[in-house]
A protein has these predicted regions:
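Enrichment for repetitive, rod-forming helical segments
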Residues: 9, 21-23, 202
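Bacterial N-terminal signal peptides
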Residues: 17-27
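Flexible coil/turn and secondary-structure edge motifs
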Residues: 28-209
Length: 209
């Protein structure tokens, strides 16, 4: 080597490799936090919210379940007592290239009435409360911002809880894809179908976000 040239050593090469790896890991961690690939919300009976989000482009899968409570692996019967702390919620898996977490949350305000505490129509109890469960600070910020903007469209205060997710518990199999499997069920005809029609009308009138 000529005087002044740097001779790479094993230690320096290893150090640079570690720095590069750290940057790569940080980049992907930040990217995952910004975009996400699922949202968990509750707005009354999960059959209704599930059916609504199944109509949205970019949504890959919607799973009904329970979250926000203090009982592990709750059953539907337990949640219905209102004593588990859980709400009926849906896990919404989406394609971030087609729809963002914020857009998923913006649609939430059209999917239910967020101004009625512990109630959606005739469904009454804490398990039917309006709730958004976030998994990181980026989701929390997006949810709070969306809620703040949505308030301008409601006369009464929005009572939606925005809380960190602990665990999402999928509901029993017979609850999954309920409306599509049971379109003639009395609840489907009396509650879910009108809510779907109202949602689709509201989205059309609002236009693309």
């Amino acid at each position: 080597l000529k005087i002044g040239e740097f001779a790479p050593t094993f230690t320096s090469v290893k150090l640079r490799a570690c720095i590069f790896l750290s940057l790569v890991v940080t980049f992907f961690a930040m990217n995952a936090e910004e975009t996400g690939s699922r949202a968990i919300v509750g707005g009354g009976c999960f059959w209704c919210v599930e059916a609504v989000y199944q109509t949205v482009p970019g949504i890959l899968r919607v799973t009904s379940g329970y979250a926000g409570g203090n009982v592990a692996n709750p059953t539907y019967e337990q949640v219905c007592t209102g004593r588990t702390g859980h709400a009926e919620v849906v896990q919404i898996e989406f394609d971030p290239a087609k729809i963002s977490y914020r857009q998923v949350i913006d649609l939430f305000w059209q999917a239910h009435d967020p101004t009625t505490p512990n109630r959606q129509g005739a469904d009454v109890g804490p398990q039917y409360r309006s709730i958004i469960l976030y998994e990181n600070e980026a989701e929390k910020t997006a949810a709070e911002s969306s809620k703040l903007e949505a308030q301008a469209h409601f006369k009464d205060p929005i009572v939606t809880e925005i809380v960190p997710l602990k665990t999402f518990y999928p509901a029993e199999k017979y609850h999954q894809d309920f409306y599509n499997k049971n379109p003639s069920y009395p609840y489907s005809e009396a509650v879910i179908r009108p809510k779907l029609e109202k949602f689709e009308k509201a989205v059309r009138e609002k236009g693309p976000s």
